[in-house]
Amino acid sequence: FNRPNLYYEVRPKTKNIDRDIIKFIKANSGKSGIIYCLSRKKVEELAEILQANEINARPYHAGMDSSTRSATQDDFLMEKIDVIVATIAFGMGIDKPDVRYVIHYDIPKSLEGYYQETGRAGRDGGEGLCITFYSSKDLQKLEKFMEGKPVAEQDIGRQLLQETAAYAESSVCRRKLLLHYFGEIYTEDNCGNCDNCLNPKKQ
C-alpha cells in the first residue's frame, strides 16, 4: 500500500480556498491534476472559476451525458486539458500515469476513498502531490447528509467520517496512519514526504 512518491498534505479550508487552489495550480502550471469535490454543483462552480482565471479546466460528473464525459476523459489523456474538476465518478478506469496532483476540495467520506483518489497521482513513479482541504464545518455538513438514511448505514458512514477526520487532524506521519488503516506497519519514524514529517506541528 505504500506509495513513496506521493506527498500527503492537509490544509485548513478557509474562505480563500478558491484563491489557494488557483495559486497552487499556477505554481504547477502545465501539469495534469484532478480536483475532487463532493457535489456536482461545486464541480461546475469551481471549473468556471478556474476557467475565468485562465486555467485549462473542465468539469466531470455523473450528471453529464456520456459523450461529454468521454470527450473530457480523452482530452485529459491527450493533454488538451490540464485540470479535471470532478466528483468521485471520475477516475474509474482512468489510467493517466503522469497526474501530478490530486486536490480534495472537500474531505473524503472515507480513508479508503481518499487512498484510491490520491492513488491516481504519480502512477509513473514521478511526483504526486496530494492536497486535502479540511474544515470541521465540512464534517458537520456530511453528517447532516446522512440523516434520513437507515440507522446501520448512518453508523457506518459516521465511523468512516470520524476516521477521515482523525487522519486530517493528526500530527502523526500521514503515511504511517494510512498504512496502519490498511493493516500495514510502517517502521520509519519520518517518511520525509508528508506535511507532518516535513513541518512537525508544535505539540
What are the functions of these language-model segments?
Residues 160, 165-203:
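Cys/His-rich short segments
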